[in-house]
Amino acid sequence: MATSSFNINELVASHGDKGLLATALVDKTAHEQLEEQLQHQRRGRKVYIRNVLGVKDSEVIRNRYGGKYDLHLTQQEFAPHGLAGALRLCETLDCLDSFPSSGLRQDLVLDFGGSWVTHYLRGHNVHCCSPCLGIRDKMRHAERLMNMRKIILNDPQQFDGRQPDFCTHPAADCKVQAHFAISIHGGYDMGFRGLCEAMNAHGTTILKGTMMFDGAMMFDDQGVIPELNCQWRKIRTAFSETEDATPLSEKLNSTIFSHVRKFKTMVAFDFINESTMSYVHDWENIKSFLTDQTYSYRGMTYGIERCVIHAGIMTYKIIGVPGMCPPELIRHCIWFPSIKDYVGLKIPASQDLVEWKTVRILTSTLRETEEIAMRCYNDKKAWMEQFKVILGVLSAKSSTIVINGMSMQSGERIDINDYHYIGFAILLHTKMKYEQLGKMYDMWNASYISKWFAALTRPLRVFFSSVVHALFPTLRPREEKEFLIKLSTFVTFNVECSFDGGEEWDVISSAAYVATQAVTDGKVLAAQKAEKLAEKLAQPVIEVSDRPEAPSSTPDDTADVCGKEQEVSELDSLSAQTRSPITRVAERATAMLEYAAYEKQLHDTTVSNLKRIWNMAGGDDKRNSLEGNLKFVFDTYFTVDPMVNIHFSTGRWMRPVPEGIVYSVGFNERGLGPKSDGELYIVNSECVICNSESLSTVTRSLQAPTGTISQVDGVAGCGKTTAIKSIFEPSTDMIVTANKKSAQDVRMALFKSSDSKEACTFVRTADSVLLNECPTVSRVLVDEVVLLHFGQLCAVMSKLKAVRAICFGDSEQIAFSSRDASFDMRFSKIIPDETSDADTTFRSPQDVVPLVRLMATKALPKGTHSKYTKWVSQSKVKRSVTSRAIASVTLVDLDSSRFYITMTQADKASLISRAKEMNLPKTFWNERIKTVHESQGISEDHVTLVRLKSTKCDLFKQFSYCLVALTRHKVTFRYEHCGVLNGDLIAECIARA
């Protein structure tokens, strides 16, 4: 390490503090410190603590989390047990920071018993298991609904389309799969083993959690956690304040070495000087986090590590490992720092001196009291006089004294009920010691027999004493009481852990798997970071959001599927194909399994969401009725899903059903399914078309196809539909599309009709093929294949028994994307056997070509190959793109000859409302206004892209969405926008063109 070439003291002495070198040194040091602080502020996450905290409480939270987070103590509102609530927020963020925060689907985190609204408002990739175990849980859910509604109403654009991710199932019953989990003060109701069983049900490997901790619970009936201002107390049951009066010896035996109790002991947590709601938890569950170390369950062994104990809060982690575990001695200690200065003293608890109890007294107080008692002891004095002397000394050492007008506490105040008995016990102890010392002196100065006995060797003395005691019991010396007990400051647990079930865990293969997965995910994140960096350099004033990035759907062909259900017996054939030596068969079987699991999870999520709403409204699984708070609950959910509604048994709907909407299923106490007009049931947007479970079942019943998959990867407008039309043979082919709109367009192009029997027979959607009877064909032609999951394409081929699939699509346009952010999607991308490119467009005008090239250069990561960098146009239209700013939706020029597209559903709804106000025909706002995603594959003469808001919208930064928007027209394209949107790719490219 380099050393300084000059002496600071000499420098200041010779040149003074105004010297140039001294000034430069001070400036340099100050600059380094300031730079360090700025770097901390930049990398530290801002955490706002609204609770009013005192000076000591503020120091507690800053000492614990001030180095990790940029804490802002705003002191806005008084809250019950404010420090505990503030710590809970920091604990949640701290535990989440232990896991990958990329936002990728495989990094979903579970929260056992947490607050789902906290994660919803912060945009965390977290699923909460929040069961309704009692009235308090239901109260919390109602309050969270209110908070969510209040915040959404203040900023609806930020939460547009975002759904709260939680369920009301107990953690062990929830089916959501994730590698990571947290439990913030949620383990009290589950215990260590309950958490391990919940982790096993979720396929969770690592859990991090927190809980209140006081080692004195191991032997005391009550105590205080001073930092949290919390008093805990053991009670017999949750409904009785009877103390746990078990003797100390029995208590130690039962709490440390035995798991069997004759009654159920609860621990009540009360916050001192706060008349607020307290908490009561099972002592057995709390004790398990102090005493247990490992737990083996269903082929997994789970171990707990106690990481940090600070301010009365213990942070722990539970890690599960598969396979065999050789025997190992695991040791841990529970320390009791609160009793290191105390000694135990036995005092009488009954007049006959049969029952005794142990009290704690300061060692210094007892030592000084006993010293004086021993010096002042006199056999000739009455015991009462000596008792008064001891009480006087004891009082002086444990009471408040006044010195020079200042009151001071001498020692520690003794309980008034124990004060007299402590003095009496010290008197008995003093008398016993004098008697023992007298006997020892007499033994030393004994008679001839005693001297002869003392002269014997030790074995002979022991033998002779035992014989005399056996023959003459009355000569046995009196048994004395042990008054003083040394209190141990810790308890040690030695547990031998071993597990011999299951197969050996191949750690090397697992390491290779994780590394490969991380590389793939890292490339996705690097591309996202590069894109953000480019935006930041172009727009240096743009604020970067702290929210996690959007989940990615990039596939990873080397990894298994996380989130799919365990394979059952009926899938043996498809499951076996995933291990086929033929690579493409294995890939297709794996993709089909993933697609089936994905559709099943969509169905389960729909059922879970509807059941949650049903329960929130007061419904249950037995009766067809709801409670009276319907409007509050449904108004709240309506802000995030405008299709939420109630159908009453009278046939009336709570809200008007949107025109053209027909709900195919509903949910009530009988579950999800078709309902009659005389039933009470609820619906949401997923109830219009609800076929996910059927698609999953059908896909699982099929086998992976062995035919050839060919893909024509062409630019927008390259004539894909024309090519399908030219090669279509009715005798051998069937045309399959990704959605209903594309099917109608192809039917019109081939048969000049969208609903004729012939058109509907030969042109069908992928869902229609899987759900309905259909003839077998030798070849299937697929339009817009990138909108299909690879597993669904394989299922279609298998259902049709096709030996060849010719797929048309643009790999750079909007691809299939998961509707469930919690599902770990890895095999959605089409894997063709043959690929051909088409880089000539016949639709897009000449001026669109350089615009798209510019967009690709700006939006795609450096080094990315794109066919749009060399595409050409055969269109005769040379100039087609224009843009103009508008103030509101009323200035949008709605013309029946134009086709209108938007990026968001909110803008689409605004355009439809405007069209209705202008009394335009239903066919116009039903068929001529679409989102960009809905318009993929559509070709129109005149297109208008409308943006009505300037709030952040990532879709305007994505090349695929901007590409689709800019390549739908043949003659003219007009971009009408409100305000300036930072990062608007289309506006920037039009301005530079």
Curated annotation (Swiss-Prot):
Instruction: List every stretch annotated Disordered.
Output: 545-576
Provide the Gene Ontology terms for cellular component: host cell endoplasmic reticulum membrane; membrane
**Region annotation (Methyltransferase) ranges:** 51-409
Taxonomy of origin reads: Viruses, Riboviria, Orthornavirae, Kitrinoviricota, Alsuviricetes
- Record has Hydrolase as a keyword: yes
Topology in the lipid bilayer is annotated as:
Peripheral membrane protein
Q: What is this protein called?
A: Replication protein 1a
Where is this gene product found?
Answer: Host endoplasmic reticulum membrane
Binding, ATP: 714-721
Sample GO molecular function, one term: helicase activity
